[in-house]
Every structure is written in C-alpha cells, then in structure tokens.
C-alpha cells in the first residue's frame, strides 16, 4: 500500500473496548457485535466467543485480553474496520485493562439497567478517562422487567460525570440497539492519529507462547508500519529480532502483508522468551528507532504472595515448567524457588490479587495436573531495622528478630464499596473489624451508598470479599487501589507442633488481634491434624512467648482389657509401661500436617460472631 491508501484506510479504523462490571453483559454484547458485523457464522457462534479459556467460560469472567478485527458497512455506505479489544473487568487485572485501553481511542461503557453503576465499572471508567478515551455509555438489559433506564442514566451523569443524554438503550441478549451502538462507534470514536511513515512504534498489549512459532506478541501500531523481514527492537530491553509473520485476528489468526497505523494484530519474530515481550513495552524499528517509547509502560509489582509446593515432591521440576509456561502468557506472575522444612521444595509466587492467585492455582491443577499445597497468602511488608536499613519481607519466615526491628509498615488500599443502604451498618462494622479507617460516604440515589475506607491489604487478602458478600446477601460490589505504606503494630506468629515450628504456618498479624487469631488457629488445627500415638501440643507463639495452646489427645490401646479382675498394682504396671512407651514415641515422633490444615489458617474468621 502507498501512503495515500494507508491514510485513507486509517480514517476508517475505529479501535474500542468494552468496559463493564461482571455480569453486566459485556461478553454478550461482544458476541452480538461479532454477529452483526458477520465475523462469525451462526454455526461458529457460541456464548462468550471471546472468552477462550475454559476457566473464563466456566466462571463467566474475562481474564486475558482478546482482540478482533471486524468490518462494518455503515449507513453512510463506507466500510469501516473495527478493532474490538475485550478487557477483563476484575480489579486484579487492572493493568491488563489499562493497557488494552491504551490500545484504543474509545470505550463502550456498559451499565446494567437494573443494577446501575458498580464499583469495578467506576474503576475502569476512571482508567479510560485517564487514557483520554471517548466514552459511549450504553444501558444494557432494558428487556428486564426490573430495568430502570432513566434512573441509571441519571446515575451515570451524577457519579461519573458523563453526559448520558444520548446513551444507547440496548439489550445484547435480545439484540436491541446493536445497530445504534455500531453507528455511534463510527460517529463518536475518533480515527487513530499517527503517521504511517514515521519510525515504527507499536504497543504490546499482550503476548502468548506458541510452541511452534515462539512468542506471539499482540500489538497496536501507533506510528509507522511493520512487515515480515523487518528488524525490530524492544525499547525497554533493547533486544532485536526479525519479524517472521504479521497478522490480524478475525477471531482466528489470519496472516496479512503488513500492519500499519491503527492496526491491532499480532507479530511473531522467533522470540524464544516471553520476558522479551513485556506487556506495555514499545516495539520500534531497529534501523530507524523511535526517539522515545509510548507512555504507560510500568513493571508490574505483585501485591500478594504465597508459597506453592507440589504434594508429590518428585514433581518439583514439572511445577517449575508449568509456572514458566503460565508466565509466558502472564507477565504479572512472579515466582522464585524456596524451601520449607514442613513442605520440602516449592516456589514463592507473587500475584496481582486473590482472584489472580486462585486462577493460577486452578490452571496448574487443570492444565498441568499438579496437586498443590499452598500456604497462607501474605503481602509485602517494609521492615525498618534499628540500624537504619529497610528490608522488604514477603514471606513471614524471613521476618528479622523482633529485637532488631524498629517498625513495620504495611500496604494500605483505598477500598470503594457500593452497597444497598439497608446493609450500610454491617459493612461499616466489617470494615472496622478489619482495621479500616472511614474516609467518605456518598448516597448515589435513595437506594445505594458508596463507602470509602482505607484498609490494610493484608486484611483484604484473607476473606474480606467473602465476608462482604455474605454480610450484604451478595449485593455489595467492591474495588480497591493501593495507596501506599503506613506503620502498624505487627508481630509474627509461629505455630508449634510438638515443640517444633512449622514454618509454612507462620503469619504476620496485628498485635491487638494476635491472641484471638492464635487461639482460633490452635483450636482449628487440633480438629484437623489426625490424632497420633502420642499426645501433641499445638501452640501459637510470638517470639518465645506462647500465647495459646491446645492438645491433640493420644490414641491409646486399652492395655487393661486382658486383665479382667486382677490386682491394682498389675494394672498400674501396665499403664506405667504404656506411658513410658508413649513418652519415647513423643521424643522421636514427627507429625504429618494435612493440606487442609494449611488452608484452615486462611479460612479462619477472626471475627468470631
């Protein structure tokens, strides 16, 4: 193509993504758009076409990004090229959302006509506004009997501050309003700006590993053109590769001759390691590099850590390979080897949040068939030592001695909770129980309230989300963002079994709730650890001071059974002999800790009702 043709084509490109809270109909709307533009035949259509991972379809959530190229013949007779970039809606994947938004010029904001705006919608809308996108509000599910489009329209204006007077009323399920949305995309969303003759700049917004072609990078071309045979360079690492193939998605991959300004597609360049295609990085031409990379690339820092150990220690290498393979598609997953006396060899893994952690665990078990033991999740604490140095601790077993610690700081998050006003009381109680500080409260309308709290991340990591859902009968929605570190009165608690520390059960807890927490855990472990031939004390200790204890009683044979009548001294002799034996066993005996015990530590609800 010459310059004229490229520019003409560029004017007809529209790049957009769809923002919505879970279950507001985003994937269904994407299906309808695919159908309307003829990207898929009736036969190929299935629910949630873009959610390709089995897990995504099962949970009904979008985890990875997907991009599709569509052609749409508008009412003005022109044929437009649409790139729909599907984004995850969940808070753990905020970075995925922000990069997919960076690859667009516009976003469709889908809001459920019955439920109104939810916490995650807000978070993603603000990301879109930060990326200067044109936002088209769509009120979905208007076919529901409980739909109140006018109330929702008002809410969009009041809460987000968007003009929703011309919001499209639609129902993706029934197919109402889809044409109108497509026309609005043509009319409202700007064409990509960029120069096809400038040095190449392409944003990597995702990457995936293909065993035959190496890494496939998903890119959005911002300036310049890329074609096979060209040498390219990654701007954050400076590594160079030669492009072997470029193409677009029509959901399936389709090879094309070149990708130019505004195109969303993929390229392969015999890249062996996915670490070389960092998400958010800029690809440029090796011979004629761009002066500076595209903004918005940042290295992802994991927020939540946990240990993962194979139940069968022989599969340690399989686990490493599995984690490496998952890391190919998931730039946010971090892991490094660690050992534990109780669990043997395993890995310390870092995740973006709890959902991310659960999904990785599930994928390891499903796709790689590795049975895992996972330890309690923890966050990164900043520990200031008395000699003036500062260390980051993400594993409770690495916590320095209490004598050396000057103060410990922990990460705090700003939690935005949307809740029906009947449940404001229980939710505020929950947040205070989790050491939250009240920041703000706004009534969105007569039925719903937005609460803002600053809460330590470590409290959210446990079971905050479940507790929130059960306290509000599932009506609350919740979103959080990191706001920084604050000093807290924290201590490390160890669990001792038969006088030995079980390193995998150590955790860090606030001093005020240490006693209750310790008591609850030893009681729980007493029920979960199978009884041994000897008596086993279970203790919770802070430093050298034991603060809670319970005892797992010994299993014992009735040695007096064969005595019938008999002299008391004979009975006493047998009992003493049994006692001696138990004592000897206790000295050399070791206790097996079942998998449930590690999970129980996470599930303990500190607020004993």
UniProtKB/Swiss-Prot annotation:
One GO-annotated biological process of the protein: positive regulation of translation
Xref: InterPro entries: EF-4, EFG_III/V, EFG_V-like, EFTu-like_2, G_TR_CS, LepA_C_sf, LepA_CTD, LepA_IV
Mode of membrane association: Peripheral membrane protein
Main location: membrane
Catalyses which reaction(s): GTP + H2O = GDP + phosphate + H(+)
Record GO terms (molecular function): GTP binding; GTPase activity; ribosome binding; translation elongation factor activity
Domain tr-type G: 11-193
Subcellular location: Cell membrane
One Gene Ontology term, aspect cellular component: plasma membrane
The protein's Enzyme Commission number: 3.6.5.n1
UniProt keyword annotation of tRNA-binding present: no
Keyword list, A-Z: Cell membrane, GTP-binding, Hydrolase, Membrane, Nucleotide-binding, Protein biosynthesis
Chain sites annotated for binding GTP: 23-28, 140-143
SMART domains: EFG_C
Family statement: Belongs to the TRAFAC class translation factor GTPase superfamily. Classic translation factor GTPase family. LepA subfamily.
PANTHER family listed in its UniProt record: TRANSLATION FACTOR GUF1 HOMOLOG, CHLOROPLASTIC, TRANSLATION FACTOR GUF1-RELATED
Function: Required for accurate and efficient protein synthesis under certain stress conditions. May act as a fidelity factor of the translation reaction, by catalyzing a one-codon backward translocation of tRNAs on improperly translocated ribosomes. Back-translocation proceeds from a post-translocation (POST) complex to a pre-translocation (PRE) complex, thus giving elongation factor G a second chance to translocate the tRNAs correctly. Binds to ribosomes in a GTP-dependent manner.
Protein's UniProt name: Elongation factor 4
Species: Geobacillus kaustophilus (strain HTA426)
Lineage of origin: Bacteria, Bacillati, Bacillota, Bacilli, Bacillales
Gene: lepA
């Amino acid at each position: 193509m010459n310059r004229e043709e490229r520019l003409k084509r560029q004017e007809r490109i529209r790049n957009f993504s769809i923002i919505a809270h879970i279950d507001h109909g985003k994937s269904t709307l994407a299906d309808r758009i695919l159908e309307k533009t003829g990207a898929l035949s009736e036969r190929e259509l299935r629910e949630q076409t873009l959610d390709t991972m089995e897990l995504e379809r099962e949970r009904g959530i979008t985890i990875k990004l997907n991009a599709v190229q569509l052609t749409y013949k508008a009412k003005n007779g022109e044929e437009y090229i649409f790139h729909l970039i599907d984004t995850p809606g969940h808070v753990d994947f905020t970075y995925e959302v922000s990069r997919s938004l960076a690859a667009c010029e516009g976003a469709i904001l889908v809001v459920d006509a019955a439920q109104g705006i939810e916490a995650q919608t807000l978070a993603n809308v603000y990301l879109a506004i930060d990326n200067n996108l044109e936002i088209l509000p769509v009120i979905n599910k208007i076919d529901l009997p409980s739909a109140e489009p006018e109330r929702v329209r008002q809410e969009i204006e009041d809460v987000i501050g968007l003009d929703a007077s011309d919001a499209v009323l639609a129902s993706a399920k029934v197919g109402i309003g889809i044409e109108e949305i497509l026309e609005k995309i043509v009319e409202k969303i700007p064409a990509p700006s960029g120069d096809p003759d400038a040095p190449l700049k392409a944003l990597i917004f995702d990457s995936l590993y293909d065993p035959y072609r190496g890494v496939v990078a998903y890119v959005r071309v911002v300036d310049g053109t890329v074609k096979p045979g060209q040498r390219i360079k990654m701007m954050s690492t400076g590594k160079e590769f030669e492009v072997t193939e470029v193409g677009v998605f029509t959901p399936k991959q389709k090879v094309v001759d070149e990708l130019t300004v505004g195109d969303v597609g993929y390229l392969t360049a015999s890249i062996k390691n996915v670490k070389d295609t960092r998400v958010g990085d800029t690809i440029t031409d090796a011979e004629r590099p761009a002066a500076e990379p595209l903004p918005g690339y940042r290295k992802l820092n994991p927020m939540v850590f946990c240990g993962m150990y194979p139940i069968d220690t022989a599969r340690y290498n399989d686990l490493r390979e599995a984690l490496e393979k998952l890391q190919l598609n998931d730039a946010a997953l971090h892991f490094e080897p660690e050992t534990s006396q109780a669990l043997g060899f395993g890995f310390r893994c870092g995740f973006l949040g709890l959902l991310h952690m659960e999904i990785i665990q599930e994928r390891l078990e499903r796709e790689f068939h590795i049975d895992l033991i996972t330890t309690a999740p923890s966050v990164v604490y900043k520990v200031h030592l008395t000699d003036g140095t500062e260390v980051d601790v993400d594993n409770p077993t690495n916590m320095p001695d209490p004598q050396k610690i000057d103060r410990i700081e922990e990460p705090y998050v700003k939690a935005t909770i949307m809740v029906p006003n009947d449940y404001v009381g229980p939710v505020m109680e929950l947040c205070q129980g989790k050491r939250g500080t009240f920041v703000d409260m706004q009534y969105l309308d007569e039925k719903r309230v937005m609460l803002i709290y600053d809460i330590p991340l470590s409290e959210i990591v446990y079971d905050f989300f479940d507790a929130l859902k059960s306290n509000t009968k599932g009506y609350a929605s919740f979103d959080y963002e990191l706001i920084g570190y604050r000093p807290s009165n924290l201590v490390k608690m160890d669990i001792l079994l038969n006088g030995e520390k079980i390193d995998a059960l150590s955790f860090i807890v606030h001093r005020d709730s240490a006693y209750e927490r310790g008591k609850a855990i030893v009681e729980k472990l007493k029920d979960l650890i199978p009884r041994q031939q000897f008596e086993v004390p279970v203790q919770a200790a802070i430093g050298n001071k034991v603060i809670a204890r319970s005892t797992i009683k010994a299993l014992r044979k009735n040695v007096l059974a064969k005595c019938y009548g008999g002299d008391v001294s004979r009975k006493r002799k047998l009992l003493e002999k049994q006692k001696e034996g138990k004592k000897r066993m206790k000295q050399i005996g070791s206790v097996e800790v079942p998998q449930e015990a590690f999970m129980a530590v996470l599930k303990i609800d500190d607020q004993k009702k």
